């Protein structure tokens, strides 16, 4: 489709201009749902990757917390070798937390993109007035988009804030100010636990949506097969009727 317009210049015109052509693909409801199912599958795979990365962040924080806990009794040892080992551990922990902050921000951006893409899918289904799609729209709204929006606007920000505070405490430790990082570690891990639980709940809804899509497709296939059988029966009856008149 292309929009073309002309002005009312009677002296040197009319002048005609046109917009950029836009191509539209007309598909059946079944074809649209099949395309949507492919989109959902690809988005879900990306979401599973995000969830795995958030879990890895939690795992790394717990690992380094454990290492700091093990080294706690060495803090009073004045030996140069021990001081060097502790300094190396402290620096490695700061680096780990910095990497975790960057990773969580990347995960947040990806999850925001996933929320937007599911919103686009929902709008596409609604705007095309696909029949029998209301249960799917409700599942997308209530099970995926709404909780993802909460995760994006609240959970990720809370994780980010807690990790930034943890980094600050660890930097104070590196500067020999003897800050205790364990409470901050626990706050970050607790927030990650809560967010992972919510991400897993969204993933479960995505998997349910896939099951619903498969069930709807099976129903459509059955209806289509019945219609084809009815048409075949009608044609056979018509053929026999014509043969009987000859």
Model-based region annotation:
Residues 1-246:
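Extracytoplasmic/secretory ectodomains and luminal regions
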């Amino acid at each position: 489709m292309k929009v073309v317009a002309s002005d009312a210049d009677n002296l040197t015109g009319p002048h005609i201009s046109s917009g950029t052509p836009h191509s539209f693909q007309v598909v059946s409801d079944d074809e649209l749902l099949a395309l949507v199912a492919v989109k959902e599958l690809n988005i879900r795979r990306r979401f599973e990757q995000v969830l795995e990365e958030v879990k890895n962040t939690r795992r790394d924080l717990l690992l380094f917390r454990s290492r700091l806990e093990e080294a706690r009794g060495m803090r009073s040892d004045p030996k140069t070798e021990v001081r060097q080992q502790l300094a190396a551990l402290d620096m490695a922990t700061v680096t780990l937390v910095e990497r975790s902050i960057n990773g969580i921000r990347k995960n947040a951006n990806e999850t925001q993109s996933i929320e937007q893409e599911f919103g686009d899918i929902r709008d596409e289904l609604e705007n095309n007035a696909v029949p029998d799609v209301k249960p799917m729209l409700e599942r997308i709204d209530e099970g995926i988009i709404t909780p993802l929006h909460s995760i994006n606007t609240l959970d990720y920000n809370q994780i980010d804030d807690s990790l930034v505070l943890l980094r600050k405490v660890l930097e104070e430790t590196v500067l020999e100010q003897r800050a205790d990082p364990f409470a901050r570690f626990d706050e970050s891990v607790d927030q990650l636990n809560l967010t992972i639980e919510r991400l897993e709940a969204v993933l479960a809804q995505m998997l349910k949506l896939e099951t619903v899509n498969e069930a709807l497709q099976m129903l459509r296939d059955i209806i289509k097969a019945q219609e084809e059988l009815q048409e075949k029966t009608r044609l056979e009856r018509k053929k026999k009727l014509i043969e009987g008149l000859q």
